Amino acid sequence: MNQIVRKAYAKINLGLDVVRRRPDGYHEVKMIMQTISLHDELRFEETGGKEIILVSNDNPLLPEDAKDNLIYKAAECILREYGIDRGVKITLQKNIPIAAGMAGGSTDAAAVFHGLNELWQLSMSMEKMQELSVKLGADIPYCIMGGTALSEGIGEILTPLPAPPHAYILIAKPDISVSTKFVYENLHADTLQKHPDIDGMVDAIRNGDLHGITARMENVLETVTEKTYPVISEIKEKMREEGALNALMSGSGPTVFGIFEEEDKAQKAADRIRELKLSNQIYVTTFVNVSL
């Protein structure tokens, strides 16, 4: 039976600015998105039936649970768009922490667009996949593209950028949950004292200047989360103490990442954070600049 396997890479935000809150309630952003080597894996198999079957980490999801999942919604979107009258079994091996600010759900949905495009030979262009997927989530079009990108508007305007220089990325997710809605509701974009130098970071990326990139790492959402969850600041501080060029919260959190030039320093920092019990979901990764 035909079978396709796809990797779904996590993302981090090297810089994140909120420009303003629009009259419709959405926030206009300007941010640098970057895929990293931490990934989920999805396997796609045709079935004899007509249902979408979703299995996660060897546990079949009940239909009522599966239908709320972005993977299911992405598959349903493709079936509807192309009038496909066939079933598919999607098996997910979940490695990316959930609700972590790393687009774990969005990247899985992006893998569905790529996987089913190949399985059913639909010949969808990247633009077509992005156009369909934006209805499901603002981060999915970026995840379909992957790599390094400047993201503007409400996240739908994407400008591809060259890969940054090689580095080791330490990921640490503290054992807390952060509501994205809470963060944005408590962010006062119009009164922010300082905005990240996203344009300067774009130049540093184009010039292959790792130190220029890390010197400009800022995330305005930290102005909300660090007050509520001091562990985020603690993890950042420990990473810098252990030799990170810089450390930052990704997205709306709570995951923190640090950028290191040497793998042994990243590993040592990981050991220290684990020892201090600041996080038990810790990974040493690298930048990835390939499409799904």
Regions found by a protein language model. Give the residues of each.
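ATP-binding N-lobe of GHMP and related small-molecule kinases
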Residues: 1-100, 118, 122-127, 154, ...
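ATP-dependent small-molecule kinase catalytic core of the GHMP/sugar-kinase superfamily
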Residues: 2-7, 15-31, 122-246, 259-292
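Short, basic/glycine-rich phosphate-binding loops at helix/coil junctions
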Residues: 50-64, 112, 207-217
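A generic structural signal for short
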Residues: 63, 101, 223-224, 258
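Glycine/serine-rich anion-binding loops at beta->alpha junctions
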Residues: 91-120, 138, 245-260
